[in-house]
Curated annotation (Swiss-Prot):
UniProtKB keywords: Cytoplasm, Hydrolase, Nuclease, Ribosome biogenesis
Species of provenance: Wolbachia pipientis wMel
UniProt cross-references to InterPro entries, sorted A to Z: RNaseH-like_sf (IPR012337), YqgF (IPR005227), YqgF/RNaseH-like_dom (IPR006641), YqgF/RNaseH-like_dom_sf (IPR037027)
GO CC, alphabetical: cytosol
GO terms under biological process: rRNA 5'-end processing
Chief location: cytoplasm
Protein name: Putative pre-16S rRNA nuclease
């Protein structure tokens, strides 16, 4: 099921499983996972997109390998919280995951996650070239941590 309400998402997620997070891009997807206590997000990897079938297959494989029970996907909303054109594509992708794998997915506003990731990497001394190669997985980590913070204040 696709969730936009953190209360509903919290009720639907297995308590002893990790949560996987995706920061969707046209060419690549940043991936992060929570720990099993669902308190801490950790950047995992960047997946370079191929086609829908391969993308879904790869994401499902690492979802299972990392003992995940639910998923968060970043949604790029405008400043006034209206959806961007890219949101429609992300929602369609999320619905394909749900239909194929029966996973609960929460859509988290991803506003400024890439800017925060880039800035964080810059102040740690990582070069712009290297930063561009890893900022999507850091963005996924930021998006997931926002969700974890939300659901842990509800618990």
């Amino acid at each position: 099921m696709l969730h936009r309400n953190p209360d509903e998402f919290l009720k639907s997620i297995p308590k002893d499983k990790r949560i996987m997070c995706l920061d969707m891009g046209e060419k690549q997807i940043g991936i992060a996972f929570s720990d099993k206590t669902q308190l801490i997000a950790t950047a995992h990897s960047i997946y370079h997109r191929k086609n829908m079938s391969k993308d879904l297959g790869y994401l499902h494989r690492i979802f299972k390998e990392n003992e995940s029970g639910s998923m968060v996907i970043g949604l790029p909303l405008k400043m006034d919280e209206q959806e961007t054109k890219w949101c429609k594509t992300i929602i369609q992708f999320a619905n394909k995951i749900i239909k194929k794998y029966k996973v609960n997915i929460y859509l988290q506003d991803e506003s400024f996650s890439t800017s925060i990731a880039t800035h964080t990497l810059k102040i740690t001394g990582i070069s712009i070239t290297k930063s561009k190669k890893i900022d999507d997985k850091i963005s996924a980590c930021i998006i997931l941590q926002r969700t974890l913070d939300k659901i842990n204040t509800i618990k």
